[in-house]
Amino acid sequence: MEFKVLEETKTKLVFELLGETHTFCNLLKEEIRKVKGVEIVAYRIDHPLVGVPQFLVETKSIEPKKALQSALKSIKKNAEEFKKEAAKL
């Protein structure tokens, strides 16, 4: 996965996630949406076979990069909890 910032301001972040598909992008979008202060989060993939996911995050009371970091930490925590539970099977 490669992260490429296309546009960044105090309240807006546009970035690409090279090498990712809808699977991870939907998860990331939903986790960013849960972060307090996020106004808009969306992504698009222009072509289903060769397109690169492009995200838009707009915030009101938090820096967009901090919202992204918070969402990624949440995903990591949930994955670790799932791994522990799966090991019990």
Task: Describe the role of every protein-language-model region.
Residues M1-L89:
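Protein-protein interaction/assembly regions in multi-subunit complexes
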